[in-house]
Amino acid sequence: MDLNGETSTKRKRSSVAAPAERPAKHLKPESSTLTPGDATPANGTVYDVEDEEDTGRVMPIGPAQADSPEWQATIEKVVKSVVSIHFCQTCSFDTDLSMSSQATGFVVDAERGYILTNRHVVCAGPFWGYCIFDNHEECDVRPVYRDPVHDFGILKFDPKAIRYMELTELKLRPEAARVGCEIRVVGNDAGEKLSILSGVISRLDRNAPEYGDGYCDFNTNYIQAAAAASGGSSGSPVVNIDGHAIALQAGGRADGAATDYFLPLDRPLRALECIRRGEPVARGTIQTQWILKPFDECRRLGLTPEWEAAVRKASPHETSMLVAEIILPEGPADGKLEEGDVLLQVNGELLTQFIRLDDILDSSVGKTVRLLVQRGGQNVEVECEVGDLHAITPDRFVTVAGGTFHNLSYQQARLYAIAARGVYVCEAAGSFKLENTLSGWIIDAVDKRPTRNLDEFTEVMKTIPDRARVVISYRHIRDLHTRGTSIVYIDRHWHPKMRMAIRNDETGLWDFSDLADPVPAETPVPRKADFIQLDGVSQPAVADIVRSFVRVSCTMPLKLDGYPQAKKTGFGLVIDAEKGLVVVSRAIVPYNLCDINITVADSIIVAAKVIFLHPLQNYTIIQYDPSLVQAPVQSAKLSTEYIKQGQETIFVGFNQNFRIVVAKTAVTDITTVSIPANASAPRYRAINLDAITVDTGLSGQCTNGVLIGEDGVVQALWLNYLGERTPSSHKDVEYHLGFATPALLPVTSKIQQGIIPKLRILNMESYVVQMSQARIMGVSEEWIQKVAQANPSRHQLFMVRKVDCPPPQFTDNADSLQEGDIILTLDGQLITRVSELDKMYEKEVLDALIVRNGQEMHLKLPTVPTEDLETDRAVVFCGAVLQKPHHAVRQQISKLHSEVYVSARSRGSPAYQYGLAPTNFITAVNGVPTPNLDSFVREVSKIPDNTYFRLRAVTFDNVPWVVTMKKNDHYFPMSEYVKDPSQPLGWRTVSHDRDRHKDGITPDAANLNPDAMDEVYEEVSDVEPEVD
């Protein structure tokens, strides 16, 4: 952590930032890439501002010249009031995703400890943060007010916490803002501790800028100037030469223009005065958006010359009037006002400015106002009841089944011109992860019952049992024309808590309470079904293979082992119908902390569990209860002979639409491969396997299937293999390859006998060398001849590419393999095929003959038990997922620095804010070594809440560093997932926050949502909404 407040995250050097899915704000590019902002993914779309705004007068100003003594004195005084704000929104809420960022604020009441900043900094949802003063003193801040519409909010700090400098405040002088006024913007520009930008006010009557799909201000004018502020300057004071704050920095352009937009301080000043007096900040609304339009446009809308003359006479300097832009359905003005109405009077008062309109509405909550408008040249007078703006601004949310919900906000309703009602999904995760989109859904009905608001939704969810499948009806707020219908699986076992969070403006926290215990799952009952028939397939044995396929859906409640997804679906092959055994790709079922459901004959859905995970060859064995399936499921016949290159076969696979396809083809190649390692974060990959490719285009379209002979015997599985993430597109590569069935038999035969294999493996990754290379590296002519005789089809040996980092109980010794060794024999058998390496599975020690540095050597090679390589425990601490280094980490690193490895982190968490990145190792807490998870949990349990502590960490590239972090038990209590075969789920969850969770069950908070977790490094950003 740099002293100036900028976060410098330590990570693997080659890692990349993974873009989120739906943009919410749009920020200025830095170094040719879009900078993520307060809720802004790196791939944010840029939106155009209305053309009218682009024609505004701009007075370009270059860098500040040598300031006059007056300006120097002013700046010296102002900087003592400016603070750098470091903050997080702990979970997605309303228009913003969970995030961590930096911004600016300034003290407006030194005695009471009030800081003025932007509303998009204070956040609509749960906030935690701190501020740093000019002398680098730090103190916590909490929100006391965020405006429902306008882009300002007020934070509170404890003035007594600042001991080494005299606190000063800036006076708010909104009336001092004038065209031509020279100004300075003093703030945390581009993440720097202090930047001073100069400019000149060019406009006072600009409409509020549109930032796209995220939070946008409206119903106010903005001030325009050329100051070239950027990310991090949000909330900066705009000061004049007298040292008074005359505006608030709010946003800027994303196209490189030096234009900035400032919020006038009239409404912030009023709110501050109310808070000082201990009064609520009343906010009124008739749910109508107004915009300023110049007189020429108003005339085209029907403004009569008489009224124009009256307005110009009353306000000689006015050039525009207020025109209705959006009237929300079901609002107070619905059916009374129309879009395009030109506002003339309110309560008999001629009115052309937003400020006066706000004054009237804010003082008339619960009352009626009279509006006179012109519509097509005709005077129309209407009466509207003024509603409470706070009442249609959500101040609570509910988390259930992994998702987060609240009432639709006025912000979202205004943006899409819809009624301000409905249940909004602000965190589409868990059971409610709909169409792979993070947020934006409106739930219309659940289980065939309407959910018009959050209360109705909550009552419906209380009655739905765990593991039930219910029909939901929904629309996305960006496409309200299309109504979707889906069946969702209600998860109340990994997410047992149904909780409500309510904003508490006294404490600045959101108070959580449990709403209802989960309804127990109903006992599954057997069901009947028939399989489809493959028409046009001449071989009956081939057509019958359809009875051996099942669809497999795997959902992970927590990101482990660097796996990038929270849900994956594919197909598995039934290898024993009587016992319910299915083999499936490990790219679909990566680890056993998961929910697995299989679908038989596209009709029967039953649960399954992990029986076996192969450490090297990319397959998982799962098991379901066959007594629940009354369908003619057939065990696939697996070939005991390896398929050969050039051999004809029949490809049967499933395309992207889950439709089965069949094609006659031939094997084009069988090559020994290892799936490329992922550079940004190690994760499971297949190594040391013979990959089969076939001569059909369907092979690239199908992720799962089989190669089958005309006799119906399965010769190979067709599997998907998770590969590397491409640096350019940030997408994960999947390989589709065949895997010969004889390689399965040593494992499947034991499992069918009721024995779970405990394999042992050599601690290495190898690759093929041809005889020309082997000869150069010292392999004798005698051995080259033996290779040719032993494997006529492929003359090859295996060279050690990488030796894995061994488990702690294994120490380096002279009988260990080294990179570059060529393996000749194991236990006296010449090794020229991958299948011949299988002898390592059951041997603790192998007698090996190798060639090293041109010399033949005999070694006693110890093998490693694979059960020690699978993850059996995870600790979630301050938003970071910690585990023992999994197998992929050991494959890619040469030394384990500790057994406390950061596998993932939640956005908006302390881990994210302070830069503790995935792939880091934690070696000590407050100077006490923590070599394993037990010692880590013991030490961090001693740390009080809201207290700083030190973590000593080491990056994947062996760079040691120290991170200071503040503990936050309110939003991020420590919890654990521990593998426990005695539990129904195979795991138990434990909360270490016993005071609030006496049942020991981890709360289902949005910060444990795997879709809000990053398993790779992603930069922490500065907040600055911008438009193009």
From Swiss-Prot:
Spans annotated as Serine protease: 82-266
Primary subcellular site in the record, as a coarse category: nucleus
Record field: compositional bias (Acidic residues): 1012-1028
Gene Ontology molecular function: any one: serine-type endopeptidase activity
Record's compositionally biased regions (Basic and acidic residues): 990-1001
Signal peptide boundaries: none
One cellular component term from this protein's GO annotations in UniProt: nucleus
Active-site feature positions: 120, 151, 233
Localization per record: Nucleus
Domain PDZ stretches: 305-377, 876-957
Biological process annotations from GO: apoptotic process; proteolysis
E.C. code: 3.4.21.-
Transmembrane segments: none
Pfam family, any one: Trypsin_2
InterPro entries xref list: PDZ, PDZ-like_dom, PDZ_6, PDZ_sf, Peptidase_S1_PA, Peptidase_S1C
UniProt keyword annotations, A-Z: Apoptosis, Hydrolase, Nucleus, Protease, Repeat, Serine protease
UniProt-annotated stretches for the region Disordered: 1-46, 989-1028
PANTHER family assigned: PRO-APOPTOTIC SERINE PROTEASE NMA111
Similarity field: Belongs to the peptidase S1C family.
Its job: Nuclear serine protease which mediates apoptosis.
Identification of the protein by name: Pro-apoptotic serine protease nma111
Biological source species: Neosartorya fischeri (strain ATCC 1020 / DSM 3700 / CBS 544.65 / FGSC A1164 / JCM 1740 / NRRL 181 / WB 181) (Aspergillus fischerianus)
